[in-house]
Amino acid sequence: SLDTTGNVDLTSANVKAGSLDLNAGNKLILDTATQTTHQVSRDGATSDKTTLGPAANLNVAGDASIKTGGDFQQNAGNLNVGGNLNANIGGNWNLGVQQTGEHKVVQRANGVSDTDLNSATGSTVNVGGKSAIGVGGDLTAQGARLDFGQGGTVAAKGNVTFGAASTTSTINANSSGDQGNRSYAETRHGADQALTGTTVKGGDTLNVVSGKDINVIGSTIDLKKGDANLLAAGDVNVGAATETHVYNSRETHSRSGVVSGTKIASSQDATSTVANGSLISADGVSIGSGKDINVQGSTVVGTHDVALNAAHDVNITTSQDTSQSSTTYQEQHSGLMSGGGLSFSVGNSKLAQQNQSSSVTNNASTVGSVDGNLTVNAGNTLHVKGSDLVAGKDVTGTATNIVVDSATDTTHQAQQQQTSKSGLTVGLSGSVGDAINNAISETQAARESAKDSNGRASALHSIAAAGDVAFGGLGAKALLDGAKGPQAPSIGVQVSVGSSHSSMQSSEDQTIQRGSSINAGGNAKLIATGNGTPKDGNITIAGSNVNAANVALVANNQVNLVNTTDTDKTQSSNSSSGSSVGVSIGTNGIGVSASMQRAHGDGNSDAAIQNNTHINASQTATIVSGGDTNVIGANVNANKVVADVGGNLNVASVQDTTVSAAHQSSAGGGFTISQTGGGASFSAQNGHADGNYAGVKEQAGIQAGSGGFDVTVKGNTDLKGAYIGSTADASKNSLTTGTLTTSDIENHSHYSANSAGFSAGASVGVSTKAVGPSSVSGSGGVTPMVFQNDSGDQSATTKSAVSAGTINITKPGEQTQDVANLNRDTTNLNGTVSKTPDVQKMLSQQADTMNAAQAAGQTVSQAIGLYADYKRDAALDAADKAYKAGDLAGAQAALNEAKGWMEGGASRAELQMGGGALIGGLGGGSALTAIGGAAGAGTSSLLANQAEKISKSVGDTTGSSLVGNIAANVAATVGGALVGGSAGAAMASNVQLYNAGNDSNNQTSNDVFASLSKKVAQAIAMTADGKAGVWNGMVNVAGVIVNLPNGGPFASPGDPGYVSLDGLKKPYKSGTSIGPDAEFWTPVLATLGLGGKAAAGTGATTTSADAATVGNGALKTASGDLSAAGNAARTQPYGNGASASPSPGTATAGSSGANAQLPTANGGVAAAGTSSATNVGKVVIDGKIGGQLEARGWTQQEVQAVVNEGPVGTTMDNRSAGKTPDGLPRNDSASVYGSKSGYVVVNDRTGEVVQVSGKNDPVWIPDSRIKWK
């Protein structure tokens, strides 16, 4: 027994008693003292350590009675009573903690570490028997452990608080260092709060009574058996204690070298809060409040019945965890750095990134009974927010108004990034350098496209990269081989000065609704009684679920079953710009260049996602409302549904919606000027995308099972895309309503993404580019990109219906719709549409695909052109070799092949069509664009010669071949668009620019082809029809001669040169072999003079040139000579079977044959075997001159062409008799045709070609006797 008028101070005391009767006139102090020590180590580290002293213990083996006139102060003290405890505290009973820990500061060479680590030791109360505790003031326990062995009562006139003790530990550190060319600095700050809740235990019923409020915050009341009864005159708060965690860091790192330096700075700031809820658990739980009961993020659960009764409100809601974080990163490089690809830069580059995020996450409360009933009564409002009510049996909620709804989780994320670069860059230039640089960039682009799941763009980038590698390799080889000329590749080094900047911002804000639930094994009943005012007495269940065997919703006014809405809002924007000027030096000399580009874009999206409310009853669902019942975005499902609505019944579905839009545009251009030429280019792209979706995800309605529905509505029943359905027989379905209206909801989904672009360029002289329209020397054009178009439209209907059954309209005079037309089929009512895709990603992929298709399009067209050129040149070479070898059939076959591979040829066009289909298909992503690409490429290839004519015509008109070439490209592009749309236009432009426009050997090949074609045609005709015609003509003439009486002055049958008529008159055809019995010796038609006899020849005549001229008087008939026949035959071509009539002055032509002519009559008699002159029209070319033509670069057509253009000079033909074909001297005037670089001299009298010079031979010395005009 201890009785005192003052304080009883048992600090760090250890008191033991068999029983205790303690009466303190003032305070009772049961504290455990703390002690603090300070230490300094040898290395300068300091430590301040706080520890507990001897524990304060008041140990009573039996019963204890404690009475105080003042407060009972217990900090880390221990009260242990083996029997019953009877306590009467006159003041407050504070069960607190003592904080211990260590504050340590360590000084190091590179920084300081400052740590403060703390923990709390709470008080304990352990009672073996029953407890009867009265507190005149407040009972406050923080981090305490209370064990009331056999239960009892704890009552306080003030507040009863079971709370959590809090301690905070901090870490602060900084360090820095400088190691020559490297330095760093780091700071760290961390603060972590730790909570220790109060734990109340008992072996039997425990009553906690308060004259004010009861607060269970972050703490636990856990009884092994018995009930936990909490009764307060004020509020009962069962909630969460919140701990806070903070982390901050700053870092800087720098490195400097001889040629470069790097600085990196980063920071991180993060704050989070975590809510630690409370728990009340017992066999049964009863909570009564004179005001409000608030359960926040906590659990109240009983094995048996649980009851919450409040005079005012009952709020069962959530607690929140929160987080906020912000990070920054800055990186700066200076000096020498990579410039991308094979280039390097000297300058500065900066990267700055910022990220912010925040979130609020709700923690649900749970109130319920495992095996019993849950009853919640509120004098005013029962509000269940984002939480759960559960009972093994029944759940009953009664209040003036009842709200069961959702709590809102939120997230926010934002990112910003800025980059900038300026300085001097050194890299490769020229066409070879450009190809190498582009190969590297296209390879990188292919990887990025693959990461972005854009397979088409990745494939196209890979094609372009492979082409750039090949063209770069070919160009490099050509340089090593010493290639010269306007199409020769170039390489050099470029030094440029420039700057670039880019920025990007994006953000996303989301809200997610966490609905509530009510789950009962038996019945779930919610009753809103109202308080007599018109607007009270409502039940609202939003985005939540009620599940029970039977559900009853009874409201004095309205029953509102409605949806909640999640939202997702995104915003983004980007911009970039750059410019540079440079100087290059390389195989094309010195050059200058400049470029500029700019881009910007934005995107926004707003989405709303609906969460339906669900009322599910395995047996009966009953809804009774004095006013309206609204089932909006909600579903009532039960075996039987009964509804009695005093107002209107509104059932409506709600739509998820998404609205999105994105835009992206870019433009850039540049020029280069070198000593050998220059070029300029420009490109632009623009893309726009939008999407709009509205669709019912879950249709609203009332669905009954085999029990049917019985719905009575005093006012109007309105169905908007909703239903009242049943699987029962129609006899069990009844709808009685004042009036009935129905309507459908139209769902739709639309998206459209379109991207377009073009590149334009031109070059004069020698181009130093390998890619783009300005890469073709002396040409240019506009190349459209393959238009990108992705779109989709869907529509569907969410219909209204009422299952078959009885429909009674009680206000027929107000009924506006014909009930007979009502849809009674409640199956498949909700027509759905697909949601729209991410239009911003779609737009990004479209831009990537367009760029890839353009790069690959040039590669494919150029590669096919090179292959076709090779095939063409090889075929022409084969034709030439076959012609010279006398294989005319082989020559013609090779020429036919060459024609197919020439510009405008079918073989070339077929390959270009294949390439166009490949690029068009990959670029446009459809069979239609593949067909369009093929059509455009094929058309452009087949019409290459027409495009060349356009180029020449426009070029001649404007005086600029470049303008002509651009006009040809535009024409090809337009033609491609007409036959193949955008893909056709792009492929047509590629073929014209990178194939035909890039074919420097086209004209030369055309000339070679024309020359060879004529030679082969002439030779074929000569050796075929011409051979037969000449022989048969000779046979007929010989027949005249042989049939002369007595042989005349000619050969007689005994002469060696005699040939019988029978042998001569065999029919000769193309390819006929002349045998020994029909040899036609040359001397047969020749004479040695008047009356002479021909000597036997030694070879058979094989060409018309070997036939001797029939001169005046050379051949005589019985009545005169045959000179008239020769005169008549001077210019008349004779074909197969041509004959000269024995009558003077006449000649008859036979069937037509090639190159078969009878000799001329002028000029006397030619010697046997001598080739006579062949008249080709205006001019005559003898054998000697004919042999010189090809060697000096002429064809007969070209000789005739320059003669037709008129003379350019005069001279004289003074050839001696030994140099003329007829053996007669010349002393005639002559005209000169052509030019000094290639001319022809023609005798004005005879038309003979006297002389030809080397054609286009710069070293040829013209005849000094020529008088030039």
From Swiss-Prot:
The keyword Hydrolase applies. Gene3D superfamilies: 3.30.2310.30. Disulfide bonds: none annotated. The keyword Hydrolase applies. Residues 317-340, 491-518, 1124-1155, 1207-1231 are annotated as: Disordered. Toxic component of a toxin-immunity protein module, which functions as a cellular contact-dependent growth inhibition (CDI) system. CDI modules allow bacteria to communicate with and inhibit the growth of closely related neighboring bacteria in a contact-dependent fashion. The C-terminal 282 residues (CT domain) acts as a tRNA endonuclease on some (tRNA1(Tyr), tRNA(Asn), tRNA(His)), but not all E.coli tRNAs, and inhibits growth in E.coli. The CdiA protein is thought to be exported from the cell through the central lumen of CdiB, the other half of its two-partner system (TPS). The TPS domain probably remains associated with CdiB while the FHA-1 domain forms an extended filament with the receptor-binding domain (RBD) at its extremity; in the secretion arrested state the C-terminus of the RBD domain form a hairpin-like structure as the FHA-2, PT and CT domains are periplasmic. Upon binding to a target cell outer membrane receptor a signal is transmitted to activate secretion. Specifically interacts with cognate immunity protein CdiI, which blocks its tRNA nuclease activity. Belongs to the CdiA toxin family. This is tRNA nuclease CdiA. It comes from Burkholderia pseudomallei (Pseudomonas pseudomallei).
